[in-house]
A protein has these predicted regions:
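Basic nucleic-acid-binding alpha-helical/helix-turn surface characteristic of O6-alkylguanine DNA
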Residues: 59
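Conserved N-terminal alpha-helix of the aminotransferase class I/II PLP-enzyme fold
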Residues: 63-96
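PLP-dependent class I/II
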Residues: 1-4, 8-14, 19-56, 86-399
Length: 399
């Protein structure tokens, strides 16, 4: 048998999903698993979206335009205007989820061997998309002790060389929940301008900012309009992960032209998903307000509960619906697997994502986990209690 590709062997396993077989086995044993590992909201999808799908009246479910339906893109212009992001429909390309938007950004803007600077910990699939594009991720460390704030500009400049082509940020951040300040965004702008880099900005969690601090989009940064590629998705905003609808947004016509070639090669974004996503823009204002309020309460429940467990520490996330917590364990990969394979308390256990998978620096995140607060408060409270019992019983606990 011929050998599989180097790309295939180097592709990292998802830290979010790699333990799923252990979770499935636990369920088969009758154990209830609290899923804290994945950002799958449990809140209902807007009724207008479900109704739009239910009422589809088409004789043919045809290919949609490769850039997405213009009616949807025109409605998105109004959505972004609410955040003072001024666009035209031509600036927006609809993608099969935010993931495809990231991949197409890399494919359109980077050559094999080009480097992207990414603050770590970072969303694990960025590495997978970089490998797919033949690019290289260079990470700049942020720490839990400093709340995952950005390091000084000099740390970025230490990484910049002739192969550096882009900086990638996620704001608010997955996995940390950190929200970049105006000073930090201006720092990134200045680097992009000074070294003529692309700025890829993943902003899918803009609705979920809990501190009263302003949301500063990469599109708000003056002087680098042609350098910015904005990544977006409806998955988290409307609890629509399964319809796979995202967007790639840029004012740079040359980037859009290159991206469109990849869009045409994959033919079209999902027709039914676009119907649901367009309808979601008409959701009652109470929908997003109630969703926001629910996550505010869940955040408080989770962070207060984590920091009451002996030996556990979590900073207070400012956005998204994740936190990275430090645990008193020797190895979070082993601990998370042990929770699923060897531990249960009163027929229950917890499924978390080991944070090491969100780092590229060897050894980083070894005693950290990412936790998503996408369960109702009653379940979060119980999951935290089960976690505390797991930490008491774990053979590799450290003080």
């Amino acid at each position: 048998m011929p050998a599989i590709s180097i790309r295939g062997t180097e592709m990292p396993a998802s830290p979010i999903r790699k333990l799923a077989p252990l979770a499935d086995a636990a369920k088969q044993r009758g154990v209830h698993v609290f899923h804290l590992n994945i950002g799958q909201p449990d809140l209902p999808t807007p009724q207008v979206a479900s109704d739009a799908i239910r009422n589809i009246d088409r004789k043919v479910l045809e290919y949609s335009p490769s850039a997405g339906y213009r009616s949807y893109r025109e409605k998105l212009v109004g959505y972004y205007d609410k955040f003072n992001i001024k666009l035209t429909a031509d600036d927006i390309i609809i993608t099969s989820g935010g993931s495809e938007a990231v991949l197409f950004s890399f494919l359109a803007c980077l050559n094999p061997g080009d480097e992207i600077i990414v603050p770590e910990p970072a969303y694990a699939n960025y590495m997978a998309f970089a490998i797919s594009a033949g690019a290289k991720i260079r990470t700049i460390a942020t720490t839990i002790e400093e709340g995952f704030s950005l390091p000084k500009v000099e740390k970025f400049e230490e990484l910049i060389n002739e192969r550096t082509r882009a900086i990638l940020i996620c704001n608010p951040n997955n996995p940390t929940g950190y929200l970049y300040t105006r000073r930090e965004m201006n720092q990134i702008r200045d680097l992009v301008k000074k070294y003529d880099l692309f700025l890829f900005s993943d902003e899918v969690y803009r609705e979920f900012i809990y501190t009263g601090s302003p949301y500063i989009s990469a599109c708000h940064l003056e002087g680098i309009e042609d350098n910015v590629v904005l990544i977006d998705s409806v998955s988290k905003r409307y609890s629509e992960c399964g319809i796979r609808i995202g967007a790639l947004i840029t004012k740079n016509a040359e980037i859009r032209s290159a991206v469109m070639k990849f869009c045409q090669a994959r033919l079209s974004p999902p027709l039914i998903g676009q119907i649901a996503a367009e309808a979601s823009l008409d959701a009652d204002e109470d929908y997003l307000r109630d969703t926001y309020d629910e996550y505010v309460e869940r955040r408080k429940c989770l962070i207060d509960g984590l920091n009451r467990i002996p030996g556990v520490y979590s900073p207070i996330p400012m956005g998204a619906f994740y936190t990275v917590a430090k645990l008193p364990v020797d190895d979070s990969d082993k601990f998370c697997a042990w929770c699923l394979s060897d531990f249960e308390y009163e027929g229950q256990t917890v499924f978390m994502a080991p944070a090491s998978g969100f780092y590229t620096t060897p050894g980083s995140g070894r005693n950290e986990v990412r936790i998503a607060y996408v369960l109702k408060k009653e379940d979060l409270t119980r999951a935290l209690f089960v976690l505390s019992k797991a930490l008491e019983a774990y053979p590799g606990r450290v003080e």
